[in-house]
């Protein structure tokens, strides 16, 4: 493909360029006419290669001639061009197009008048032209005989399959190898494919489908065939299964022939297309050019995927024309759009050559191209060839718009005219070339004016003219070169000893080309070296090279030597009209020249809005004149630096901005209120989950602390997302429209900035960390800590290397914040060589405190508690409980004042922490402070704390010290793992006996590491102990309470075994409170020992946890009474079960309060529970029991009294996700699978924990339920090849959990426990374990209700799968309906209206939406057609010829 610029060479090209387009005209044929003709021939599906010879041109003319009468002007021009080209090839002298046409006409007439020569040997010639590789060949007798496929052909096919598998290339390869083959030959080819049986099965299915379709469309004739007549082939005959080779040959050579081979080939290609689609699942729509991907690589991927697409050639052509450009990256897209819609692939690839490099370079090229194109067209139209507008330019800094005497940049050393040092420009006596580029441009202008007028239009499209047009400033002429002018570019790497060229000016150097010395621009953006007219030795050949916006004609000299600053290289030099001599990459790469940008582009992170959301459209609120002025200044500066860009009214989004004054400064700071955009932006995963702590630092000999300047503003923002960051600076009194900007970099205050910056910074530092493993770098946001055990000089040298590395990526480390000497201020801490502390904290002294003041105060105290032990904030926090305004004044309580005074005393003495020594043991010591507050210290040596902290979280309303202590230990252990990666040894203020007494009853509360007892008052103790057995001789109290929900009136009382009883009335109470009141009453009325029997699980649960403090006054009173007693036994019995004392007290407290309910079904529920051990929800549902009764039945079962329940986290609950795990019981292995969304269970005892058994179980599971994903641990059976193969075959995705982290397998781990619990309850009902397992699975799936919807796991999984299918169908239906447009007529208006959007289609009417209005139209007055989209619809589209029902089904 592509334009052919080398049709003519040497003298013939000169002959071509001497021929005029018209008789008497001024314009002559040029090389561009050949390029245009070849492009047009491609459009007409003709081979442009035929233009290379006279015979080829004659064939093309004969082909086009019949269409000339009805053809367009373009077709006639093409025929004329080919006629002239034919004359040039045939050496027929002509002066213009008309003469060429006349000459060809004469030749055609001569040819007609010549007698025809005998055609002897034509058959032989024809026969020789036929490839002998075809299976059907003609023998000497003229008969068509079959020649089997050669082993070489079959071997080539097998090799293709082995190497390419089923890539798109396989289809053209198959077509080429099977040209003219019979079905038998094709089956031979398919049979040679050994592997890929799955693909072959798919192919077989496609062939069967097509054969069946053939039989349907070609029914067999009825009755016997006449003698001598051949039968018509059936579908199976075409596939070669029921036909002989002789029959196949006869069908293919009959008159008329039935090409059974071609038909079968077509079927095979259909099947191969389907296989290729499966093996290459990438859609053409997904092929997009990466930001740094070369255009050539992108085109290769595009066409490779296009070949796999199952679409007609027309659709593929459309894809090529539109998608190739649409999915290019922004830099290439801008260039491709400028080339126009008719550009060939060769032109595209030429124009985009080198653009796939750094984004900065590509952006510059694209901008220059856009500017040049618009500028040249205006330039030509106006005829402004008289001169170019000159702009003033500074000799000092090279920028436009001011003179050197007004320049604010530092004065450049040396003379501004010649560049030499020792004198200034006014004293310069050197009349040679100027140091800057203006003199060269002036001479070019003079030369340009000498151009002949008839060449102006053509020259306008050449790079020479374009360069002159844009060369008023270096903004355009310099950007495409090796650098940009400006103060940021004078950066060099001091460690390199190579020649360096400063980029204050464009990098122009004296270069020796052949024997001549010329000034040339070193351009790393140019592929080729192009020099203006120079005499070189050797032969040359003509060539066209593509500039941006056009082509120029040059002479190509090969093997030319060039000397650049003492370095020699040999390569190709192009000589032609160029505005500036250019040394391109073909020479620069040979001499090792590299372009070192101070800001190399960081790869942008793609960002999107949340699905279904649009950008923010929040109006800008009014601002004062002072703030508007400040914002304008700030934004003007930011725009110069490229951080923001101006935008027009086409951007509909807006975010409000405002300004505040900086602390201790008169300067203003711009703030953007990104709250609305943050709500709409996708979620990000924070790369760092917390901040580093100095206690985790190891002591280092040398330390440096630095700061990254303008951190966020050094990272580019995704181009497609920038529009959503738009904001507006308003004007006073709406004097002018607001100035609109959008961000090009990460904005402050936007939710994605921290995560993107952290990710980018980590990638940038990674190579440096690998290079210097002896250096430790802590990086959190823009703070850097660099530590090492190197000598200080060597350390600082490495730090400077790090600064240089960051600078290459555009990150500066300002000297102002570069700390070389201790103490180092880092992350709010103060670091000394052998200790650390928090930066000095001063607590404010205030008369009046607001909520905001208290919040800041608590924050400071929390920060200080890292190193100051004993800090408390509980009473201060109580002051700001509830929802209060930030400015609301707070009145201090006495406790809060005391707490603040204590904290002030603690902070008076400065305290320090030490650094971590990996060789020593970590120890954590915990003390109780009272009022639910705890403090702790972590150290390695006594009195040298690494870190301190406090804890004051109350996790439940009723608690005790041991519960809190367990929570403190867990917090300290977690903190230690985060900072040091291991848990410390604990010293706890509790005795072993007290702890173990609690622990035996409440072991499920939490996990506790190794610990030892420390006698640090106040000691933690249990204030009372409940007896485990009834106390003989003590009075037994049956207690009960009841309340009326409506009146809130209640009664509480007790009955004793000695005949005593008491009932009290209570107001404003609940059932639970009344039950507790009854226990309190019994405790108050009893002696030092008592047995208490209650029917309240609630009361029983609270008191059994042995709290020593509670937020409930009632529970507090019970605790006080329990502490006074010597011994108390508390027991529970189910209510309403005919238990003597319980029944009597129930009758006492129920009178007038609640009606006694006759609860039918209790016995049946109990029987079922004894058999299946159903949970309370299942029984409450199945037997219509109140929840409390069902719970009491479960609670009274000794097999169901297991302690503790698992706490659940969040896991993937998609409908197709299952978790698998192996658990062990009775020395056997049980493989368990849990449907995560429903809790449905499948389990089986397997003989061995092998991949084979696991794979078999997975296949059985997949055969019963729709399994999409299985989540397993990293056990050897799950990671085996057998399991992977089973998952691949069944189309199941396999995911793995996190090693040594059971939470990642939460659902199945929990189900293992549940399964074992159920097995334990019913084990005595089964002889074998495998029977018990299946019984337990049945009970869990169908006899236990609860969870979402209160249904069983079996009901839930069926409901989830059914809902998923319905949802998918509904979505598909909605999408299908949306593909149709409706044309309709109103009742009185005969004109068809539309197209409208189809919302719903019924039998008698349709619901449509037209311009926002929803209408119901009778079915007979509506036409429904498929909407093929604007690009697909053509003139031949017949809307009414659709079967809408079929399309919509």
UniProtKB/Swiss-Prot annotation:
The record marks 223-224 as: Cis/trans isomerization of proline peptide bond. A zinc finger (CCHC-type) spans 392-409, 413-430. Residues 499-503, 547-553, 586-598 are annotated as: Dimerization of protease. Residues 1380-1427 bind DNA. Protease: The viral protease is inhibited by many synthetic protease inhibitors (PIs), such as amprenavir, atazanavir, indinavir, loprinavir, nelfinavir, ritonavir and saquinavir. Use of protease inhibitors in tritherapy regimens permit more ambitious therapeutic strategies. Reverse transcriptase/ribonuclease H: RT can be inhibited either by nucleoside RT inhibitors (NRTIs) or by non nucleoside RT inhibitors (NNRTIs). Residues 518-587 form the Peptidase A2 domain. Residues 279-365 are annotated as: Dimerization/Multimerization of capsid protein p24. Keywords: Activation of host caspases by virus, AIDS, Aspartyl protease, Capsid protein, DNA integration, DNA recombination, DNA-binding, DNA-directed DNA polymerase, Endonuclease, Eukaryotic host gene expression shutoff by virus, Eukaryotic host translation shutoff by virus, Host cell membrane, Host cytoplasm, Host endosome, Host gene expression shutoff by virus, Host membrane, Host nucleus, Host-virus interaction, Hydrolase, Lipid-binding, Lipoprotein, Magnesium, Membrane, Metal-binding, Modulation of host cell apoptosis by virus, Multifunctional enzyme, Myristate, Nuclease, Nucleotidyltransferase, Phosphoprotein, Protease, Repeat, RNA-binding, RNA-directed DNA polymerase, Transferase, Viral genome integration, Viral nucleoprotein, Viral penetration into host nucleus, Viral release from host cell, Virion, Virion maturation, Virus entry into host cell, Zinc, Zinc-finger. One of its GO terms (cellular component) is host cell plasma membrane. Residues 824-832 are annotated as: RT 'primer grip'. The reverse transcriptase/ribonuclease H (RT) is structured in five subdomains: finger, palm, thumb, connection and RNase H. Within the palm subdomain, the 'primer grip' region is thought to be involved in the positioning of the primer terminus for accommodating the incoming nucleotide. The RNase H domain stabilizes the association of RT with primer-template. The tryptophan repeat motif is involved in RT p66/p51 dimerization. This is Gag-Pol polyprotein. It comes from Human immunodeficiency virus type 1 group N (isolate YBF106) (HIV-1). The gene is gag-pol.
